[in-house]
Amino acid sequence: YTKANPDNMILGSGTSDLIRLTFETVKPERTLIVGPTYSEYERMAKLAGSEVDKFMLQNLDDFELDVDMLMKRLNDTIDMLIICNPNNPTSKLISKGNLNTILDACLDHDIFVMIDEAYIEFVKDTELITAISLTKKYDNLIVLRSVSKFFAAPGIRFGYAITANTDFLEAAGNSKTPWNVNTFACIAGIMFEDEHYINLTKSLIQTERNLIYSAMSTRKTIKVFKPDANFILIKLLKEGQTAADVFDYCIQKGLMIRDCTDYEGLGNQYVRFCFLKPEQNDTMVNTILEIV
């Protein structure tokens, strides 16, 4: 499925288990996190005793990564860099070319890089974007994957990580929890062979992503950030309107969206929602456009 060397793979009880294992193995004193992003990275870093720095993506840049600015933050005091690609909640992607540039700089500064690809399979041309192939070139890289999002199986609790760093693989093998992959997850691995589901899901998400962005991007009272993943981030521009207002309105209509107020670097003007079936997406878009 990933075309990776099985000897370079680590299995875990979801990506949270693998994030914890990565911190326990690397033992970084200082971690740099590209944000706004998934809060679990910071929580795990602090549990591991690491200091945390942030490199915050900016609204004015449409939350696109400014690689040159990030490069200026990379130095010998940083032990670990964390990137979510595509990023949650911005739904923005970093190209493989830019990842190469970042990884080269991290090698120079002896920085270990963790790239979380929980949403990568929703991206167009995943095989051209994924950093898995880069693990053959960079031994300071680990790539995390999950079945929770693309395969819609969060309850299975199954994730996997890929790295060519033999020291990491040995240390992680010695410290990971025994029997950390349950029987149901082992059986569910057959889902990676379901080409019909994989191709159908990719096609559906790509079509709906384009339709949703087109339908919402012309509204002047919101700023819609062009998505690369299976969800979209929106900034509310109507004076006095908050994410809580839109969230409550959607709840009353039987719809669930994400109020992004608690994301550091966003605030109470941002909401996010995931793409569903076409008819559900139509309802979601129309409902949000009723209030914004």
Where are these regions (language model features)?
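Active-site phosphate-binding strand-loop segment of PLP-dependent enzymes
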Residues: N59-V123
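PLP-dependent aminotransferase class I/II
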Residues: N140-F225
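Conserved PLP-binding catalytic core of the aspartate aminotransferase-like
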Residues: I205-Q206, R219-K253
